[in-house]
Structures are given as structure tokens and as C-alpha cells.
């Protein structure tokens, strides 16, 4: 149990739990809404990053729509009364796609094969293609969609060659989708727009929309909104007919809440203090398991202290290790360990490995 004094409350919460600060969420949504107004673009919330049904309707009120990848996410977005719905997945089953086509606003197919199979189906959806621009950007390989061997999107040279050979194949092409950035500043957008203007001059006049994807660090305190607006104004001065969409993942819930755990035991192993928490990398912190992500822990520092602990989970998996940290104060059984900035890409990945329960979500 932990007392949420840091959130200005006195009641206790059962751990593990995710606690969201609604004031910070509102600040992020207000900033994103202002970016929409200043730049004239439409920002879509990516449900894959955060999908709590109690919060989605409020997000839908503030932003222009949602980005989805499946029938289940479509249902979530519709229940939240989201306006514009953009659909994209690496591949679609025909029977599932037919159920969604008339329910979404825009769709991006991921390959030429899927385009050839499905783009001629009569529907209300505006059809597009996801392109891999093969940009050379400093992005971790596990989430870099620009890699030459990435399965995400058609390589831009392959697309341009196909268009040149048979432009009639793309007669229904309304939009292009570029998801090429990761936690990027406005500089990343500049690189992407330069690529688009350099390579698609023949195609741009015929398009209705471009989806510039996620990876834009909009709600970071250092994000240069002025430069962002200027870049888009320059692009729109030439291509005013093209609607621009962005679908940030983390930006909506960045710095909006933490994950709270409790120390169950402290075990001395080979002259090291191993802390067992009421969580697991397999159940609540899956990105630690998948990509060896290092989490931010409240009350720790990078330099040495007398209180050095290895934080671990409470499952039978030997590799259930969160990481090693220098704490400012000594830990005791029953203490809270707080993982900071944990709203994005966490709850959507929870499992029940080893019988562990899902962590509760609390809005304060």
C-alpha cells in the first residue's frame, strides 16, 4: 500500500498501480490542441500507446481523431466518439478489413501486395500507402522503421519505380503515410519534409492527405513549436490542397503519471541487495523485457550512494530484472518504489504471466 501524498491526496492505494495526473494530461492536450490551431494540421491519438476507456473520450474531445490498427481499436475509438479515424496495420485479413473500411476516414496499406488486393474495394475510406523513406536518423534499431530491411512500409525507391511503370495501379491513391521518426524534435520533421518534396514531386499534386506519423516529441518542454509551424507553413504554401495528419504516441500522456510498486523483500545475494517488488517486467513493464529499456526511478541518482539495489520482479523468471539503481535513501520492506513517466506503452502491454494481476489504473 502507498500513500499518494506526492499527488496531494491522503488515501492509500493498493500496489502495483498506475496513477495518472489529470492536470498534466490536460496540459498536454491543451498544448497539442494549440499546435493544431497554430499550424492547421490534425493530430490523432495513437490508441496503441494508451487505451484506457475512461480517458479516451476526453482525448477525443480535444484532438482531431485517433489512429487505430485493428477492429478492437476501432471499437474503442468509436465508443470514445473520436472524429477522424486513421487505420493502418502491417497486413489485413480480408474479412476483418471489410468490416472496417466504411467505418474509418483514411487507411494506409503497408505493401504493394495489400494495395493491389484491397485498394479497388468500394468504400467510404480514403486510400493511402505507407512509405519507408529510408532516412538515416539516430533511432534505436528495435523501433527504427527506416531500416532497409524493415517490413513497415514500401521502400520509397520500390514505390517510385512501380508508380513510374504503372501509374494506373495507383489511380485510387489519395494519401501517403510516413512513420519515420522517434522522440524527435522539429529537426526530424524538416528532414522528412525535405525527403517528401525531393522525391514525390509528380505525385504530391494528386494527393489529398499525408500522414506524417508519430515520433514527434510535441509535449517535451524543449520542443520548438515555432519552427514546427514555420516548416508546415512553408510546405503548405506549395501544397495547400494536402491535409496533414500527425499521430504521436507518447506525446499525449508524456509526464502524466507514474507506476507505483512496493518492496516485498530485500535479499542479500553475492554481496548485493536484491529488491523484490510486487511487479514484473513480464506483466507490467514489458518494454524492459523486450528492449532492455532503463526506467526512471524516483529517489535515485546516477552517481554512487551507499544504497545500491538491484530491482527485480516477483515471478519465477530468473531474468525478471528491472535494473540496478543508486538510491538516495535506504530501502526497507514496505517502502514504495516509484517508476516515473509510465503512462505510454505500459498498460496496453500488460500480461498475466505467472498469475500476476493487472495493475490498477487510478486518475487523481
PLM feature spans:
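N-terminal capping/small domains of soluble enzymes
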Residues: 2-82, 87-96, 280, 327-340, ...
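Active-site-proximal beta-alpha core segment in soluble small-molecule metabolic enzymes
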Residues: 41-209, 234
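Structural alpha-helical segments in enzyme catalytic/regulatory domains
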Residues: 231-239
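Charged (often Lys/Glu-rich) extended helix/loop segments that serve as interaction or gating elements
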Residues: 231, 243-364
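Glycine-rich beta-strand-to-loop/alpha-helix junction loops that act as flexible
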Residues: 179-181, 210-219, 248-250
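Charged helix-capping and loop-helix junction motifs
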Residues: 190-196, 224-231, 261, 326
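Feature marks short, surface-exposed loop/turn motifs that line or immediately flank catalytic pockets
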Residues: 135-137, 182, 218, 252, ...
Amino acid at each position: 500500500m502507498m500513500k499518494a501524498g506526492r499527488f496531494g491526496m491522503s488515501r492509500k492505494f493498493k500496489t502495483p498501480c498506475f496513477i495518472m495526473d489529470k492536470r498534466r494530461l490536460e496540459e498536454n492536450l491543451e498544448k497539442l490542441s494549440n499546435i493544431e490551431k497554430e499550424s492547421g494540421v490534425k493530430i490523432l491519438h495513437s490508441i496503441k500507446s494508451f487505451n484506457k476507456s475512461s480517458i479516451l473520450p476526453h482525448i477525443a474531445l480535444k484532438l482531431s481523431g485517433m489512429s487505430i490498427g485493428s477492429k478492437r481499436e476501432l471499437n474503442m475509438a468509436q465508443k470514445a466518439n473520436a472524429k477522424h479515424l486513421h487505420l493502418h496495420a502491417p497486413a489485413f485479413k480480408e474479412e476483418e478489413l471489410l468490416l472496417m473500411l466504411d467505418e474509418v476516414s483514411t487507411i494506409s496499406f503497408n505493401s504493394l501486395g495489400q494495395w493491389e488486393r484491397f485498394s479497388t474495394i468500394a468504400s467510404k475510406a480514403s486510400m493511402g500507402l505507407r512509405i519507408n523513406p529510408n532516412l538515416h536518423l539516430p533511432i534505436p534499431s528495435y523501433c527504427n522503421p527506416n531500416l532497409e530491411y524493415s517490413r513497415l512500409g514500401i521502400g520509397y525507391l520500390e514505390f517510385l519505380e512501380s508508380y513510374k511503370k504503372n501509374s494506373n495501379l495507383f489511380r485510387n491513391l489519395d494519401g501517403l503515410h510516413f512513420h519515420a521518426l522517434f522522440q524527435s524534435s522539429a529537426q526530424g520533421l524538416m528532414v522528412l519534409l525535405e525527403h517528401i518534396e525531393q522525391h514525390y514531386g509528380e505525385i504530391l499534386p494528386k494527393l489529398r492527405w499525408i500522414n506524417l506519423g508519430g515520433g514527434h516529441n510535441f509535449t517535451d518542454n524543449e520542443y520548438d513549436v515555432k519552427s514546427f509551424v514555420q516548416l508546415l507553413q512553408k510546405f503548405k504554401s506549395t501544397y495547400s490542397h494536402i491535409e496533414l495528419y500527425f499521430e504521436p504516441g507518447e506525446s499525449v500522456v508524456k509526464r502524466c503519471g507514474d507506476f507505483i510498486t512496493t518492496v516485498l523483500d530485500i535479499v542479500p545475494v553475492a554481496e548485493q541487495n536484491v529488491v523484490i517488488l510486487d511487479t514484473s517486467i513480464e506483466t507490467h513493464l514489458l518494454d524492459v523485457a523486450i528492449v532492455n529499456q532503463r526506467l526512471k526511478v524516483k529517489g535515485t541518482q546516477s552517481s554512487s550512494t551507499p544504497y545500491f539495489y538491484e530491482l527485480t520482479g516477483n515471478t519465477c523468471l530468473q531474468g525478471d530484472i528491472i535494473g540496478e539503481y543508486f538510491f538516495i535513501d535506504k530501502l526497507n520492506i514496505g517502502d514504495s518504489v516509484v517508476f516515473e513517466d509510465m503512462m505510454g506503452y505500459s498498460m496496453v502491454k500488460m500480461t498475466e504471466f505467472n498469475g500476476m494481476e493487472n495493475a490498477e489504473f487510478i486518475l487523481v
